[in-house]
C-alpha cells in the first residue's frame, strides 16, 4: 500500500534522475567535466616541467614560437600571460649579427680558415666609423657589409700573396649594451686598433687607459695593438704631433700609424699591417712554444707587466718624456713599421 509520501518520494527521485540526465545531455562535447579537469591538473605539472627542460613554456595558440638561439630566464618563463621583452636581461648569446661572429666557440675554426677579427677602439668622434666604412669600400664590389649588422664589415684581402678574411668591428659604442659588448670585444679580438684624433688631445690622453683595460682583461695573450692617429689631414687643427704619437706607442709597446679616413690616406696600410702583426705574433708564439712575454721565476708575469705599463703611462702623462727622450727615440724607431714586430 503506497501512501502519498511514498508517491512524492518516487516523483522526486525520478525528477533528480531526469535533471541529471538532462544536464549531461546539455553539456557540449568540448566542455571538460570535473573528472577531466582533475586529469588535466594531474598532467599539467609533468607537461610544464618537460617544456621547461626544453627551454620554455608551450606557446599559446596563434603566438609564434620563440627563437631558440637565446635562453629565456626562469623569471620570464613564469610570466605565462605576459609578452617577454628580450631587452629585459643582458643577452648571453646571439645567433645573428656581430655577436655570432664574436662567439668564442668559433675562435679555433676561424684561425684555421684564415679569419682575423680586428676591433676598433677609442673615444667618440675620432673617426672609427669612417675608418670602418673606408675599409668596407677599398675594393668596391669585393667588400660587403655583414648580414644583420650595421657596424661590422668583412672582406677578403691579399696580404703578402696570401688571402685572408678580415672582419672589422666598429661596435665599441653601442648605447646601453656598451658595457658587456666592450668586454666581449676585448676578449675575442685578434688585433686592436686604438683610434684617437690628432685634433683632440683628450682622445689621445685616453689611449693608455684603454690599452691597460685591454691587457688587464687578457694578460696571457701577446695582442697586436696599433695606435691610430686619425684626421691627419686637418693640419691647422692638429693638437697631437706625430712625434708624440710615436713616443706613446714606444712607451706602451705598440705600433703607431697616422691616417686620414676622409682622404683614404694610409687606410690600406693600416688594415694590411694589422694582418701582418697578427701573423708575426702568432708565429713568434708558435716558434717559442710559450707566451712571448718575459716571465719571472718569483711569480707570474702578467701582474708585473700590467704594473710596468701603468708606471710607464703615468710617466708619459706626467710630461717626463724629455728626460728620457733618447730611450723613447730608440723604442719608437720602428713603431711605425707594421711589417715587423
Swiss-Prot record:
Predominant cellular place of this UniProt entry's protein: membrane
Subcellular location: Cell membrane
Biased composition (Basic and acidic residues): 43-54
Renumbered residue ranges of the record's region Disordered: 1-72, 84-106, 282-309
Organism domain of life: Eukaryota
Feature: compositional bias, Acidic residues: 1-13
Positions with a binding annotation for GTP: 122-129, 230-233, 261-262
Protein's UniProt keywords contain Protein transport: no
Pro residues composition bias: residue spans: 294-303
GO molecular function: calcium channel regulator activity; GTP binding; GTPase activity
One GO term describing the cellular component: plasma membrane
Compositional bias segments (type: Polar residues): 18-32
Gene3D superfamilies recorded: P-loop containing nucleotide triphosphate hydrolases (3.40.50.300)
Coiled-coil spans in chain: none
Chain positions found as Phosphoserine: 27, 296
Pfam families: Ras
Keyword vocabulary terms for this entry: Cell membrane, GTP-binding, Membrane, Nucleotide-binding, Phosphoprotein
InterPro entries, sorted: P-loop_NTPase, RGK_GTP-binding_reg, Sigma_54_int_dom_ATP-bd_1, Small_GTPase
Comp. bias (Low complexity): 94-105
Tissues in which the protein is found: Expressed in brain and kidney.
Entry similarity comment: Belongs to the small GTPase superfamily. RGK family.
PANTHER family, per database record: GTP-BINDING PROTEIN REM 2, RAD, GEM/KIR FAMILY MEMBER 2, ISOFORM C
Biological function: Binds GTP saturably and exhibits a low intrinsic rate of GTP hydrolysis.
Protein name from the UniProt record: GTP-binding protein REM 2
Source lineage: Eukaryota, Metazoa, Chordata, Craniata, Vertebrata
Amino acid at each position: 500500500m503506497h501512501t502519498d509520501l511514498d508517491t512524492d518520494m518516487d516523483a522526486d527521485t525520478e525528477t533528480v534522475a531526469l535533471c541529471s540526465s538532462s544536464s549531461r545531455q546539455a553539456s557540449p562535447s568540448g566542455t571538460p567535466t570535473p573528472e577531466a579537469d582533475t586529469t588535466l591538473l594531474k598532467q599539467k605539472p609533468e607537461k610544464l616541467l618537460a617544456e621547461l627542460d626544453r627551454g620554455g613554456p608551450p606557446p599559446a595558440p596563434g603566438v609564434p614560437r620563440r627563437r631558440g638561439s637565446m635562453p629565456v630566464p626562469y623569471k620570464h618563463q613564469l610570466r605565462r600571460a605576459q609578452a617577454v621583452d628580450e631587452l629585459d636581461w643582458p643577452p648571453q648569446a646571439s645567433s645573428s649579427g656581430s655577436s655570432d661572429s664574436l662567439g668564442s666557440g668559433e675562435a679555433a675554426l676561424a684561425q684555421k680558415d684564415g679569419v682575423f677579427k680586428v676591433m676598433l677602439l677609442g673615444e667618440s668622434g675620432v673617426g672609427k666609423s669612417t675608418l670602418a666604412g673606408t675599409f668596407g669600400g677599398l675594393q668596391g664590389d669585393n667588400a660587403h657589409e655583414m648580414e644583420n649588422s650595421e657596424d661590422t664589415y668583412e672582406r677578403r684581402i691579399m696580404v703578402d700573396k696570401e688571402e685572408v678574411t678580415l672582419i672589422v668591428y666598429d661596435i665599441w659604442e653601442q648605447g646601453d649594451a656598451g658595457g658587456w659588448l666592450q668586454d666581449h670585444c676585448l676578449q675575442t679580438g685578434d688585433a686592436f686598433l686604438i683610434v684617437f684624433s690628432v685634433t683632440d688631445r683628450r682622445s689621445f690622453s685616453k689611449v693608455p687607459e684603454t690599452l691597460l683595460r685591454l691587457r688587464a682583461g687578457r694578460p696571457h695573450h701577446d695582442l697586436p695593438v696599433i695606435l691610430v692617429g686619425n684626421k691627419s689631414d686637418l693640419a691647422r687643427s692638429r693638437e697631437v704631433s706625430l712625434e708624440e704619437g710615436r713616443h706613446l706607442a714606444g712607451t706602451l709597446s705598440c705600433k703607431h700609424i697616422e691616417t686620414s679616413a676622409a682622404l683614404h690616406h694610409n687606410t690600406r696600410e693600416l688594415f694590411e699591417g694589422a694582418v701582418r702583426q697578427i701573423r708575426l705574433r702568432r708565429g713568434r708564439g708558435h716558434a717559442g712554444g710559450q707566451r712571448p712575454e718575459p716571465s719571472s721565476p718569483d711569480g707570474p708575469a702578467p701582474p708585473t707587466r700590467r704594473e710596468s705599463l701603468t708606471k710607464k703611462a703615468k710617466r708619459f702623462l706626467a710630461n717626463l718624456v724629455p728626460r728620457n727622450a733618447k730611450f723613447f727615440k730608440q723604442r719608437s724607431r720602428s713603431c711605425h713599421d707594421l711589417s715587423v714586430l
